[in-house]
Amino acid sequence: MLKFQEAAKCVSGSTAISTYPKTLIARRYVLQQKLGSGSFGTVYLVSDKKAKRGEELKVLKEISVGELNPNETVQANLEAQLLSKLDHPAIVKFHASFVEQDNFCIITEYCEGRDLDYKIQEYKEAGKIFPDNQIIEWFIQLLLGVDYMHERRILHRDLKSKNIFLKNNLLKIGDFGVSRLLMGSCDLATTLTGTPHYMSPEALKHQGYDTKSDIWSLACILYEMCCMNHAFAGSNFLSIVLKIVEGDTPSLPERYPKELNTIMESMLNKNPSLRPSAIEILKIPYIDEQLQHLMCRHSEMTLEDKNLDCQKEAARLINAMQKRIHLQTLRALSEVQKMTPRERMRLRKLQAADERARKLKKIVEEKYEENSKRMQELRSRNFQQLSVDVLHEKTHLIGMEEKEEQPEGRPSCSPQDEDEERWQDREEEFDEPTLENLSEPQPIPSMDLRKLESIVEDATSDLGYHEIPEDPLVAEEYYADAFDSYCEESDEEEEEIVLAGPEKEIKNEGSQPTYRTNQQDSDIEALARCLENVLGCTSLDTKTIPSMAADVSPGPTIFNSVMARTKMKRMRESAMQKLGTEVFEEVYNYLKRARHQNASEAEIRERLEKVVPRASDCFEVDQLLYFEEQLLITMGK
């Protein structure tokens, strides 16, 4: 089962969504399959009927929230609108949310690579580890996403490997805001939704949750990517809490760069004010150098993708044009087949006349180009051989040239021709030796249209068409003779003429090229832009978030006790299914007494191992007791 949420659990309870495939939800989303279940609810893969091509698949999270009060519903919708405006390549896109009966439904972006926890477990079982450069790249992507949220005063509150998803090998932060949407912004809401392995000391001690708490969780994820294990592990819930609050700071193995280990240790500082912010980490020289390498690589990838997309787009346009021509040809063929033999013959002769006109036009254009080129060469040759000093030319010579009369019998010329004659006269007066070597300009031959028409007739004589006789009786006999052979052969000829091209095109219709979706391209391009923005930002003052900044997003401020009880009910049902009802009751009652009596961890472990094979199997029961106690304290206040 896919690990999109908490460890998969079989949860009973009411549901507003049918598990049958192809079910239509909210008149827009078609249910494809169930992806998994978690502590909050069930996750489905759906297809959006109104989405763009290539972006139809989305994820629907169905969360049972009980009967929400009207003010809680309104505030949850306001928070959903805020989350839907977030747009970053390292954050899962939040599309929409709606309430259906006693379920709150959230529509988010679909990531086909599953979550980071699944990827880590897959590598761990295979005995492999992630390459250093891959870890650095993923870590930088997470830093960019966290910095984007913190700039907008939005806290995640539940950063962990199961809430980070892979899409085209890019990490995307997801499932944030769920606690704010459903349980409010109090400390207990964070404790109930958070996973103990990633929770910061101040969150466990109810000293407040701020941006530096997300930084702590991010450091735990970095350690998990490097070591394939949790940074703070233990056999039960309280042992993990003690390690986080009072234990030593873990270190990375020696195979990783010292700079990376130093950064992680600073992020795991138990004093929140001493932890660096996301933008401060991005400005550390070691990370800044890695940023530059990533930006160069992503820029090259973007350029290659654009070139490839241009080629694919050109191929797509060619295929579309060929298909259009094919359809037009089929329509024309159908029109021809509906004609009578006389109409077909007339159409054929009209086509022959059009072809003859096109050839005439082509020959005229060629002759015109030839004459123009020849005139240009003559003008250029005469102009290059002039040796007149225009600046020192005598004014009386110019006056004499202007008064010269035109030769008899010579037609009047345009002003442009007069200028050419002046230059030629100056050549004769000032540079006679040069002009003697010049060949006299040849007159441009006039075009004989009759001769041109005869040439075209000779060129088109191979068509085998003859003029229609003007005499009606002769023409009737002419048509009768022509149609005998035409009716038998014309259909085949028409098919050869009209369908010569489309046959190849029809064969190519079946093999359409696969296109990369716009979303994949935009993620890489957007990530490259984010890297450029971070490298271009030289001042930390403009982006640094105060270490103790409160989460001021317009979210719910009232704690939803119904949602908290629902979560604990699911946790109890899951533990009962794992241990059995009798064993669960025995473990639950014993741990409740042991915690009140402050029994030692060794004593508790020894007693639990007599009831269950492993003491770690009771982790969920221990966590349930802790949550119940915290809930009573909160409700008492």
UniProtKB/Swiss-Prot annotation:
Pfam families: Pkinase. The modification Phosphoserine is found at residue 273. It comes from the Eukaryota. Its EC number is 2.7.11.1. Residues 302-385 form a coiled coil. Its cofactor is Mn(2+); Mg(2+). GO terms for cellular component: nucleolus. The active site is at residue 158. Phosphorylated by NEK2. Phosphorylation at Ser-273 is important for its activation. Residues 399-446 are annotated as: Disordered. The keyword Cell cycle applies. It catalyses: L-seryl-[protein] + ATP = O-phospho-L-seryl-[protein] + ADP + H(+); L-threonyl-[protein] + ATP = O-phospho-L-threonyl-[protein] + ADP + H(+). PANTHER family: CAMK FAMILY PROTEIN KINASE, NIMA-RELATED KINASE 11. Interacts with NEK2. This is Serine/threonine-protein kinase Nek11. It comes from Macaca fascicularis. The lineage of its organism: Eukaryota, Metazoa, Chordata, Craniata, Vertebrata.
